[in-house]
Every structure is written in C-alpha cells, then in structure tokens.
Amino acid sequence: EKNVGQITQIIGPVLDVAFSPGKMPNIYNSLLIKGQNPAGQEINVTCEVQQLLGNNEVRAVAMSATDGLMRGMNVVDTGAPLSVPVGEITLGXIFNVLGDPVDNLGPVDTSTTFPIHRSAPAFTQLDTKLSIFETGIKVVDLLAPYRRGGKIGLFGGAGVGKTVLIMELINNIAKAHGGVSVFGGVGERTREGNDLYMEMKESKVINEQNISESKVALVYGQMNEPPGARMRVGLTALTMAEYFRDVNKQDVLLFIDNIFRFVQAGSEVSALLGRMPSAVGYQPTLGTEMGTLQERITSTKEGSITSIQAVYVPADDLTDPAPATTFAHLDATTVLSRGLAAKGIYPAVDPLDSTSTMLQPWIVGEEHYETAQGVKQTLQRYKELQDIIAILGLDELSEEDRLTVARARKIERFLSQPFFVAEVFTGSPGKYVSLIETIKGFQMILSGELDNLPEQAFYLVGNIDEATTKAVSLQVEGQ
C-alpha cells in the first residue's frame, strides 16, 4: 500500500504536500512525483522532506526543476531517504545527486545502495593516531603535510593549477596507496566538470577501454541545478566514499569542489523553508549543516577518508560566515599563488602561506620539522630582501644575504616538480618523491652542500639526485 499525498503549494524549488492523517513521512524521506504536464511531457521529480508543518502537511525541497508541477498532483512517499549506488561499479562513471548515471554509458548495477543520510562514525571507532598522508608532492609533504583522514582546504583563483593538482593527487593515491577517489562537483561550472572528465580520460585516471580499471568516481551537481541538488550532491559523493572506507577498508580521497557552494545552496532554500536568516543572510543552521557533512569525513580503525575541499572566498573576505565556518574544520591549507604560476613554478603552492596542524615536531619528527622551518626562514628572508634587490641589485647585499638568496632561489625551483598528469605540458615524465627523499634534498640545499650547482638544475626535477645529474648534463651542454 503506497502512501500518497497531494501537492498543496509550490514556491520555486520548495513545495508543500498534504498526506492523510497519521500517514506523515519522516524528515529526509524521499518523495516521488510522476506524471505528465499539460504539454504531455513526462515529469519525474524527487523531493526530500525538510519540515513537518502540522495540519498533515510536509515541506520538501525538490532535487530537480519544479517546472510543470501543479497543485493536486499525486506524491508518493518512498518511506526511506534518498539512496545511491555504491561500490566498484561507481568507478569511472559520472552520477547526479540521485545516483543516476549521466555519462550515457548505460545503466549501473544498483544491487548495493546506501542512504545519503547516515550518522558519523562513533567516537570509539575513530582512529586517534595522527599520521601523515604522503602525497609524493614535495612542497605539500614538506611544508604543509596532509593528515590521513584529515580535511584540507585548497585556495586559489582561476588558472593557477587547482585542477591539475587535484588530478595528480588522484593519480598518486591510486599508485602509492592503492586507494580510490571520489570527486564531488558542487555548484561549479558545467564546462569545468566536462574539462575535468576529458582530462581524466586523457591522463588515464579514467580508463575508457576498461572502465572498471578507473581510479575515480565523479558526482556532479553543477551551477545550473536547483539548490536542492547542490545542497545534497556533497552527501551523495561522501556516501560513495564511505562505502570504500567502511566496506572495502581502503584509503579514500574525497574532493569537494566547491564547499562554499554547498553552504550557498543551503542559504538559497533556507528562507523559502521559512527560517529566519542569520548573519549576512546565511541560514541559521549553517554550523550544523557544515558539521553534519564534515563529521562524516574521518579516519576509522578500518580505513580513512581524506578530503580536499576547494574553498571559494566570497569577495576575498575571510571573515564571511561561510569560509569562517569551513576553517574551523580544516587540518591544513594549500594556497596556490598566481605569482609562482607566472614564474612557471608548478605546482604553484605558496610555501609561506600554506599551513598545516600536522607540522609539529612530536608528529612529524624533529628532522622534518627543522628542515621545514629552515626552508621557510630562508624563503622569508629572500622575500624581505626582494625590495633591496629590485632597487640596488644583488651586489649591494652582504655576503651572507647573497648566499641566502642563492639558496632560496634553489629551494624555490626545487619545490617545483613534474607531474604525471601534466606530462603533456612539461614534456618530462612525472615524479613521485617520497618524504624521506624530500627531507634529504632540502637538508642538502640548506647545509650548503650544493652551493656550487646552477639553480636551473633544481627546476622541475624529482629527488635531489636528479638535480645533480641535471647539473652535469647542463655543464656538458654548456661546453
């Protein structure tokens, strides 16, 4: 016996539905509206119950456009929250918020599904040991290391290499950790989603010939979708990632691009749901909404979800409630700098602006900590001397400062690295550098062992041995 109600009111993406007494659906239940509009086109809309209004009515948010819906149409209560397919079958395919494939590769086997609303792992299941998540990218591992099961904010404007960095991470976790990735595109441009998909196919992160060999599942709810979809697509992606962590016991990377759009979508429907706005017009439930998403991203004793979230900062105001609420959850930040990208230093991660709570001697060890501090001090000094160099030239500096500048320039170049997914642009094969090799390399530069090598030798190489080899070949070319 189906529980059927009728639409009583529609305001944009929000609609009210009346059910018979005693038959009210639960909050977060998914409702289906099927039928035809006056033009005879099929209507198939899924909604999610948000409020019980009393008088046997509920208020729900639609996951797709509400065009063509009318009062009095029948609404079926499915009796359960929205469920999406999970497991290996999701790899290599693109899904929407409802878990339907949208890549025209045919239907997906939905024998295993999970509801998108699940409680966070119990405190007793959490992995309390702090460990570093090695990415194989020198600048990240040395100066702002990621925490296994942590949350990382990725800041950067357009065209500084966010996408390439994301793809390299997806590639490296698959190679080094045997892990998989889930990419949640939340309220970003459809064109970017398409570009990412094409680039992933090109760099073999998605294997077209053998889809099951792919390393990533994509979930998109882009800018053109109604707010309901953008508000929930993050949970859909997270649910797919949780399956890999809890059932397959793997290390998972979860990308959310962009976490701000998740908050924005919530604020779009908040007023329509009749809630009082809070600061700057955001939803009063901002902290809770963010918390319920973020608390599910964590390490358990079985596996981990490490999440990398692109953070858009509205009007560059870091005190805006949306980014400010996000910061409370982050373990590390990776800041991309346009200045470095302009110099051709990729990945253009700003070594002085990027931070990590993991960079403590008792977590990473004295050696790593000292090396990182040394690198930062050298770069900071170089930054301070830049005005003097610009006005007076290098010759006016003291002997000590000239040495610092020379080492800083070597460090700056050594922080660049050829990526596997960017072999097309750089023409040199990608390099994965282990943390031990990274620390060794920077220690050698700081100690002055390599003062006699030209700075070009450090540009776009993997470990320090490659730099010495490159120096020799440069010398041969010079002769």
Curated annotation (Swiss-Prot):
Record note on quaternary structure: F-type ATPases have 2 components, CF(1) - the catalytic core - and CF(0) - the membrane proton channel. CF(1) has five subunits: alpha(3), beta(3), gamma(1), delta(1), epsilon(1). CF(0) has four main subunits: a(1), b(1), b'(1) and c(9-12).
Main function: Produces ATP from ADP in the presence of a proton gradient across the membrane. The catalytic sites are hosted primarily by the beta subunits.
Enzyme class, UniProt record, top EC level: translocase
GO cellular component term of the entry, any: chloroplast thylakoid membrane
Main location: plastid
Gene name for this UniProt entry: atpB
Signal sequence coordinates: none
Catalytic reaction equation(s): ATP + H2O + 4 H(+)(in) = ADP + phosphate + 5 H(+)(out)
Protein name per UniProt: ATP synthase subunit beta, chloroplastic
Species, as recorded: Trichomanes davallioides (Kilau fern)
A Pfam family annotated for this UniProt entry: ATP-synt_VA_C
Example GO biological process: proton motive force-driven mitochondrial ATP synthesis
